[in-house]
């Protein structure tokens, strides 16, 4: 089974870890902790404070994370979740595993990195490890929270537009819980 290195919100204790252990997404088995053999820039940026590993080997810091063995279904889910290849790119990376006796072993695993990014991202602070609640003060903004605020705004817009449409037509279509449509006609103008 393929190995995947996670360094950000998919790590244990981080906001998206639940996606990695959700069996409906596929199977993922924790193997060990590791760090990149080469330094990479791990930056936190964007409206949601997303951690990105920029595919610029030799720059930044050696990054700590976790290696998981995943089945094909989980790999496909991760590609979808990471919007690969449009948003992130899945590439192979060399990782160093520290053994209990002080020796190291090198393993190769897939990692989701950014090859396309804003030029100023290379000037952002880099990190060797990610924690959403870290000292950096850049807490990850849950996608669900962002979606909820977007939905709340769309709902408010919809309600306002519906009210205007009702006043215009003096009728209202109501969808009941059984899914039946009912037309309600008003005898006078709505106030």
UniProtKB/Swiss-Prot annotation:
The keyword Lyase applies. Its EC number is 4.3.2.8. GO terms for biological process: modified amino acid catabolic process. GO terms for molecular function: gamma-glutamylaminecyclotransferase activity. Pfam families: GGACT. It is an enzyme of class 4 (lyase). Keywords: Lyase. CDD domains: GGCT_like (cd06661). Substrate binds at residues 7-10. InterPro entries: AIG2-like_dom, GGACT, GGCT-like, GGCT-like_sf. It catalyses: epsilon-(gamma-L-glutamyl)-L-lysine = 5-oxo-L-proline + L-lysine. GO terms for cellular component: cytosol. SUPFAM superfamilies: Gamma-glutamyl cyclotransferase-like (SSF110857). Residues 155-191 are annotated as: Disordered. It comes from the Eukaryota. The active site is at 82 (proton acceptor). Residues 155-178 have a biased composition (Polar residues). Belongs to the gamma-glutamylcyclotransferase family. May contribute to degradation of proteins cross-linked by transglutaminases by degrading the cross-link between a lysine and a glutamic acid residue. Catalyzes the formation of 5-oxo-L-proline from L-gamma-glutamyl-L-epsilon-lysine. This is Gamma-glutamylaminecyclotransferase B. It comes from Danio rerio (Zebrafish).
């Amino acid at each position: 089974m393929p190995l995947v290195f996670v360094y950000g919100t998919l790590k244990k204790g981080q906001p998206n870890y639940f996606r990695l252990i959700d069996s409906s997404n596929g199977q993922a088995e924790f193997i060990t902790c590791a760090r990149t053999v080469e330094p990479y820039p791990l930056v936190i940026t964007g409206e949601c404070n997303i951690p990105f590993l920029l595919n610029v080997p030799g720059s930044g810091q050696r990054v700590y994370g976790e290696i998981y063995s995943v089945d094909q279904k989980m790999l496909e889910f991760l590609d979808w979740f990471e919007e690969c290849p449009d948003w992130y790119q899945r590439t192979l990376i060399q990782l160093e595993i520290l053994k209990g006796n002080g020796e190291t072993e090198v393993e190769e695993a897939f990692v989701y990195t950014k090859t396309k990014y804003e030029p100023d991202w290379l000037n952002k602070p880099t990190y060797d490890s990610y924690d959403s609640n870290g000292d950096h003060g850049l807490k990850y903004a849950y996608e669900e929270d962002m979606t909820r605020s977007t939905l709340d705004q769309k709902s408010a817009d919809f309600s306002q537009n519906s009210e205007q449409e009702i006043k215009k037509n003096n009728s209202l279509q109501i969808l009941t819980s059984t899914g039946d449509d009912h037309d309600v006609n008003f005898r006078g103008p709505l106030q």
